[in-house]
Amino acid sequence: MSATPDPIISRHVAVIGAGASGLVTARELRREGHTVVVFERGVQVGGTWVYTSKVDSDPELTRTTVHSSLYHSLRTNLPRESMGFMDYPFLAKDDPDRDPRRYPGHREVMMYLQDFTREFGIGELIRFETEVVHVRLVAEEEGFKWKWKIKSKQRLRLRLRGKDENETVVEKEEIFDAVVVCIGHYTHPRVACIPGNSSATTFNSQFQLVKHVRRNIIT
């Protein structure tokens, strides 16, 4: 007789980030019978593939932080058949609004991830405009064992009849059985430390990072 498989134990799992890795992670966890919450601080899925023409302002404490790392004319450096998920290939679509090239532009990758999200109903798992600000292992004396506490901040926009839209921030603490971090590596640039670059006489202007470039890239 074959051994009886162990019953699946459903866990409450947090996934941080709704980019490519976060989306497929959420899908696989739900397929295994777990309840999943995806935290995404942006307003849409896509992670590093979300393009904006905005850039960070000067390095001041009050500057606006822009998390996109794409320039306008960027194309993939891998063929599309190497970029898709195994059971959801990145196929060219017969649609005038899509990019059928083997090495497509960033917008096509973004649309592929949006298609993937719709196909598997992942959107219902995502809390948009919600930033995770702290994750820690819960101490046993708090009544839990091997659990994780997540503190998050969610921006909510409320519009009352006849009044302007108001924004409020809701802070929340929740307990999860497991946490999967899928935040990527391209949000904050790594600035090279060059001896003497803090001197005003070394360079006549500030450094410009590739992350802050949007146009005028040769293709």
Language-model features, listed with the residues they occupy:
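Short interface patches used for recognition in eukaryotic signaling and trafficking proteins
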Residues: 21, 92-103, 114-115, 159, ...
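Short hydrophobic core segments
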Residues: 16, 132, 173-186
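Glycine-rich active-site loop/strand segments that organize a redox cofactor
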Residues: 41-115, 139
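Amphipathic alpha-helical protein-protein interaction segments
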Residues: 18-19, 38, 98-109, 122, ...
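Glycine-rich dinucleotide-binding loop and its adjacent helix/turn
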Residues: 90, 105, 109, 118, ...
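N-terminal Rossmann-like FAD-binding beta1-loop-alpha1 element of flavoenzymes
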Residues: 6-38
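A conserved short coil-to-beta-strand element within the FAD-binding core of flavoproteins
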Residues: 128-147, 153-159
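Core beta-strand elements of the Rossmann-like FAD/NAD(P) dinucleotide-binding domain
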Residues: 9-11, 164-178
